[in-house]
Amino acid sequence: MSKEKFERTKPHVNVGTIGHVDHGKTTLTAAITTVLAKTYGGSARAFDQIDNAPEEKARGITINTSHVEYDTPARHYAHVDCPGHADYVKNMITGAAQMDGAILVVAATDGPMPQTREHILLGRQVGVPFMIVFMNKCDMVDDEELLELVEMEVRELLSQYDFPGDDIPVIRGSALKALEGEAEWEAKIIELAGYLDSYIPEPERAIDKPFLLPIEDVFSISGRGTVVTGRVERGIVKVGEEVEIVGIKDTVKSTCTGVEMFRKLLDEGRAGENVGVLLRGIKREEIERGQVLAKPGSIKPHTQFESEVYILSKDEGGRHTPFFKGYRPQFYFRTTDVTGTIELPEGVEMVMPGDNIKMVVTLIHPIAMDDGLRFAIREGGRTVGAGVVAKVIA
């Protein structure tokens, strides 16, 4: 089968369905692909194709995730759907499937349920920037007042977690009826697609963000100076520009005097490229793996942050026993491990393998970080958990 050429003409946006079990996330995913394929072209995906989600590994954690793609006239979407609640938790925390926006599915027959709340909270913690609500199964509710009530509850819940509950689009539909080809419900899927286009802003591309390169290796080249190597995470570095070396030690300024890739000299290094950057006036021993090279002032070193963490179960190769408040594992950021201590939420005495939990982490060395940075929790090089920086404290 020949691969279709990927058309780069339209903006690309990553979305996903979230919400309580059996509220119709997967049916909606199937309905979106089917109705949009019928309306705008593209290929439909059946419910069972999406439901049999393949296993993936992200940061050593196995996650079942389905990826589908669809197009509106304005955009190309990559959409992620997970079969089980645990898969959502893992997916959102590891950032395996980053979402520029999420479709929160709430069954009109049930209203918001515990996982509805948990997914909204997770979305807030891990930095899902926009939510759109699809009220599903509206064909099964005759009472207009009941629909109003459910909508109000969902909006209040979103506002509780700092989403703009009053402004978020709420579409009342029926994924199943749309999938079965009933025109009035198909129209609701088109309405949803319209909101995906208009309500979720086009994401900023990695190349347009401020320059950052996690340092993997440091060499000294006689007569030329010190070279650091790594993959540019975002932005562009040009020869002659000032850069900062951030993390672990005090922040130091330098100038990029050369960029090379595969032994060839370039005038810049761009997001996604593996490059060597030559630094002026820096000694080999002043710099180490785990620091980052960044645009001056764009990122700061921190030691303390609030995080959302998933602890691997025994079956996933994680711990066999719970841990308690004196726990001191390593936190692996980008290219290096840093030891840290943890503070558990009030009333939580221990954390079991397979749990997800909010915790405050204090590191023994500062690391360059922003909200949304992902990390692994390790014990002697073995991954036992995954986390995301929800909020930098100090």
UniProtKB/Swiss-Prot annotation:
Residue ranges, annotated region (G1): 19-26
Keyword Cytoplasm in annotation: yes
Ranges for domain tr-type G: 10-204
One GO CC term, this protein: cytosol
Region annotated G2, chain positions: 60-64
Residue ranges, annotated region (G4): 136-139
Record region (G5): 174-176
SUPFAM superfamilies: EF-Tu/eEF-1alpha/eIF2-gamma C-terminal domain, P-loop containing nucleoside triphosphate hydrolases, Translation proteins
Alphabetized UniProt keyword annotations: Cytoplasm, Elongation factor, GTP-binding, Hydrolase, Magnesium, Metal-binding, Nucleotide-binding, Protein biosynthesis
Main location class: cytoplasm
Residue sites binding GTP per the record: 19-26, 81-85, 136-139
Swiss-Prot/TrEMBL catalytic activity: GTP + H2O = GDP + phosphate + H(+)
The protein's Enzyme Commission number: 3.6.5.3
InterPro entries to which the protein is assigned, alphabetical: EF-Tu_GTP-bd, EF-Tu_GTPase, EFTu-like_2, EFTU_2, G_TR_CS, P-loop_NTPase, Small_GTP-bd, T_Tr_GTP-bd_dom
Keyword hit for Nucleotide-binding: yes
Molecular function terms, GO-annotated: GTP binding; GTPase activity; guanosine tetraphosphate binding; translation elongation factor activity
Binding of Mg(2+), residues: 26
Function (record text): GTP hydrolase that promotes the GTP-dependent binding of aminoacyl-tRNA to the A-site of ribosomes during protein biosynthesis.
Family matches, as PANTHER family: ELONGATION FACTOR TU, MITOCHONDRIAL, ELONGATION FACTOR TU-RELATED
Assembly with partners or alone: Monomer.
Recorded family membership: Belongs to the TRAFAC class translation factor GTPase superfamily. Classic translation factor GTPase family. EF-Tu/EF-1A subfamily.
HAMAP family: EF_Tu_B
Name of this protein: Elongation factor Tu
Origin organism lineage: Bacteria, Pseudomonadati, Pseudomonadota, Gammaproteobacteria, Enterobacterales
Gene: tuf1
